[in-house]
Amino acid sequence: MKRSMYAGRVREEHIGQEITLKGWVGRRRDLGGLIFIDLRDREGIMQLVINPEKVSAEVMATAESLRSEFVIEVTGQVAAREQANDKLPTGAVELNVTALIVLNTAKTTPFEIKDGIEANDDTRLRYRYLDLRRPEMLENLKLRAKVTHSIRNYLDELEFIDVETPFLSKSTPEGARDYLVPSRVNKGHFYALPQSPQITKQLLMNAGFDRYYQIVKCFRDEDLRGDRQPEFTQVDLETSFLTEQEIQDITEGLIARVMKETKDIEVTLPFPRMKYDDAMALYGSDKPDTRFDMLLQDLTEVVKGVDFKVFSEALAVKAIVVKGAADNYSRKDIDKMTEVAKQYGAKGLAWVKVVDGELNGPVAKFLTGIQEELTTALALEDKDLVLFVADTLEVANATLGALRGRIAKELGLIDNDKFNFLWVVDWPMFEWSEEEGRYMSAHHPFTLPQEETAHELEGDLAKVRAIAYDIVLNGYELGGGSLRINQKDLQERMFKALGFSAEEANDQFGFLLEAMDYGFPPHGGLAIGLDRFVMLLAGEENIREVIAFPKNNKATDPMTQAPSTVALKQLEELSLQVEEDETSKTN
């Protein structure tokens, strides 16, 4: 029998109609000789009523055999419920069943198919096809589909061209580790799965496409956390002949369209802009959450003369004031925060509380001589808690930035209904890597330096600034972009500044340098992390909740058991041999 409609779309207007529905048994209840079934499909739940006086004995017997997650087909007449259920869109109606067919049976599921379950993450991923039956997961993925639909429509209207770029590409040394794919035909050679389509989209600009976009999978072999996956999706854009401002305007329009069409929220344009240095100084983060205050305060000069060497001899002393929170945090609580501070490189965490107009705490005695100045500088009031970090400027900023976010969550200072977008601009071109012992690209080596600082490519790399811009939402980096280098000599200087010899640069990027001999236009672009964007729109805290089949935090798939070993014959075809580690040898 042909399905008449989705179960979740039956309404009062259908009363009196005979319809056929198909779906899963959510719940079965026997009451006063009647059997009630909650039939579930992707659009919602519909109540079925099976009355022994109105159906055959065969239908009744079938109804009595039903269990959760059986797949069924039912035909019957839509009727008004005696008592409506206001919690369901279908709550005013029910279906009086006249025919019932079991399309498939089901074993008892490892967890209930409902929202708010307490199953652990690996169990949910092991049975992801069951987890995805839950309404909240289904709604998350429907939201994702709406977002991509909105994005495509917007970019199509602006005459962007959707172009697919290769997944089997060349490994390059900058950025995160590549996922490598061995070549059977070219033994000893490897493809890399792209971390982004960066170079290929730039080459499309050289080819004259002018405006390119792609909603594309990217791959990075890096340590995982709540907002990262080894394979992720980004909305990738590139344009020719546009300024930084024009690219940002297009991006803001895209986000405004998505927010309106998926959340019915009107966002204010243009988005605020904040310089990188200001973001670090005031928020301790290059992706500041501006939904709450608690800004970082620089006290380096204020505490210079105190008789406390930790402060007076520190390169930087910074603080945050947690308003009215003195009673919220015990010594034990602050000790826990001190451990967090140490994770960010700080040697410790100093603190005072304002009690009856006086400073109290372990370092209060060193601050009595500057109490008035400190009170004015920090606008202190009774019951305030002040947290200090004395260290390098970088460590002080990072530590207090992390504590700021943690405390705001603990005290409920964040309005979760707010969507605060902003641009972080005027980025450093390079950042120092302690692990590598050298400067590395803050974004990537194709970013155009600001003209007035480009001469420092042969001088102090810390002074080189990039024409780069990140878009931030509620403390998350939503995406980033830049204008790109289109002059060969400047690109060669950039590679040299990063430590590449001419031979190494040519080996890794010779095809790009060659392309710059053929009229490469000025160009720039941006990429938005789709998974992260949808996560924030859905109010989730982990991007796994908006990806159909994600990996766990060990980069494995508990359902398919990927990654897995492969047959020896497959390895031989690729001229590969797997070395056993010492643990394997002893087991």
Swiss-Prot record:
InterPro entries: Aa-tRNA-synt_II, aa-tRNA-synth_II, aa-tRNA-synth_II/BPL/LPL, Asp-tRNA-ligase_1, Asp-tRNA-ligase_1_N, Asp/Asn-tRNA-synth_IIb, AspRS_core, GAD-like_sf. It is found in: Cytoplasm. GO terms for cellular component: cytoplasm. It comes from the Bacteria. One of its GO terms (biological process) is aspartyl-tRNA aminoacylation. CDD domains: AspRS_core (cd00777), EcAspRS_like_N (cd04317). GO terms for molecular function: aspartate-tRNA ligase activity; ATP binding; catalytic activity, acting on a protein; nucleic acid binding; transferase activity. Belongs to the class-II aminoacyl-tRNA synthetase family. Type 1 subfamily. Homodimer. Signal peptide: none annotated. PANTHER family: ASPARTATE--TRNA LIGASE, MITOCHONDRIAL (PTHR22594:SF5), ASPARTYL/LYSYL-TRNA SYNTHETASE (PTHR22594). HAMAP family: Asp_tRNA_synth_type1. ATP binds at R220, D221, E222, Q229, E477, G529, L530, D531, R532. Catalyzes the attachment of L-aspartate to tRNA(Asp) in a two-step reaction: L-aspartate is first activated by ATP to form Asp-AMP and then transferred to the acceptor end of tRNA(Asp). The gene is aspS. Residues 198-201 are annotated as: Aspartate. This is Aspartate--tRNA ligase. Its main location: cytoplasm.
